[in-house]
Amino acid sequence: SPSYKSRSVLSGLERVYELGLTDCAMYVFILLLGFYILMRTFRARPPVAVFGAVAWAFSSYFFIIIGAGHLWKVLTLAFIPPTIAGMVLCYRGKYLWGGVMTMFFIAWQILSNHLQMTYYFIFAMVLMSVGFLITAIREKQLVRFAKGVGIFVVASLIGVAVNSSNLYHTYQYSKQTMRGSSELATAGKHDQSAASGLSKEYITQWSYGVGETFSLLVPNVKGGASGAMTANEKAQADSHYAEYMQTLQQLYPQLGGSTPGLSQYWGEQPGTSGPVYVGAFVCMLFILSLFYSKGAVSRCLMLVMVLSMLLSWGHNFPAFTNWMIDNFPMYNKFRAVSSILVVAEFAIPLLAALTLSRMVSEPDLLRKKPIPLYISFGVTAGLCLLFAITPGTFFGDCLTGNEHKILNELRGILQPEMVNSFATD
């Protein structure tokens, strides 16, 4: 993003928060620190807060996007948990600390210049706010909540205002890009979004598959990262794969091309650097939270997770996705809807850590209510076992579009040979 003199003080303060660390160490550190701060605002004990921070920071997505060079996205995501922590403090009557934290972390989010992630997490913050509103009504603390909302909004506006120069110039040049209005597209006929933003096809080109969502539990449920199967040691040791490649080497030269290879990844996306994975133990604690979590905020966090999954499916869930693109403000300005699954990757560790926090603070909980633990362990272990024993039951076709093309080409080679053989007989 452009560097303006007006941002030098804000950038300097950010470097202090990052302890002057560089490269990957800095990204991991601020991911850990930000979520730790959030857990402490939820009154979790330090060891539990550390667990939550590790579960968030060491989920696979962050290392994938660091490797892919999406460094501004990592920075933005690292500043989101402490922003939400500021919101929580505001709603709980800690107006000064909540306002200061909100102001700085929103300012740093926008400074990181990846507005798509900020936009996606607005959904999470709105739903969490609904949860806090319900709690305030139950506890008869509406006045405190209203003050908190006011301070949070003012602090947010200040955080946005200090980045006004960057936002203004981004807005101006966006009009001349594919995210601006198109002079060629006609709204209303086929794709309303193309007239004022990106086309639906482009927005949903990277859409997470419905079955692919199980990668949160089992990382390679769709093969893992894109790449030639020749790099996979297990495939090289498989005799069937060796026979397949030998057959291709014999047949494919007839088409005048080089021998193709199979891809490790066979999901619905055009390609991927790796799956979104949070870990089996974290998933088990999340399932446990369905039984042990208390309060409206936790329930709203579950809605956050479900919403992000539905939106991440993109063209695999067209009714909801198309409605969002056509009707929700600014939703058609961002591509790769699969990336919204990072919101679920936030909600799941948070709910898991909050559940662990309750178990630590109430030592007799498991003794009094042991059945939910058996259910959560059984569901997690049962799914993993089923995927291991009968993977074909859940994921029948393991071929991508490219592999189907290879098969069709092979049929084209073999069919004339079979006809000639029949004619000779």
Predicted regions and their residues:
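Transmembrane-helix motifs of polytopic, lipid-linked glycan transferases
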Residues: 26-42, 282-285
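Periplasmic/ER-lumenal interhelical loops and adjacent helix-loop junctions
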Residues: 1-5, 9, 165-289, 392-425
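Transmembrane-helix signature of polytopic, membrane-embedded enzymes
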Residues: 39-58, 94-99
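Transmembrane-helix signature of membrane-embedded glycosylation machinery that interfaces
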Residues: 35-44, 84-87, 91, 290, ...
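Contiguous transmembrane helix-bundle modules in multi-pass membrane proteins
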Residues: 53, 69-80, 90-107, 115-156, ...
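Alpha-helical transmembrane segments of multipass membrane proteins
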Residues: 36-38, 61, 86, 107-108, ...
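Loop-to-helix entry region of an early transmembrane alpha helix in multi-pass inner-membrane enzymes
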Residues: 4-33, 66-75, 272-273, 338-342
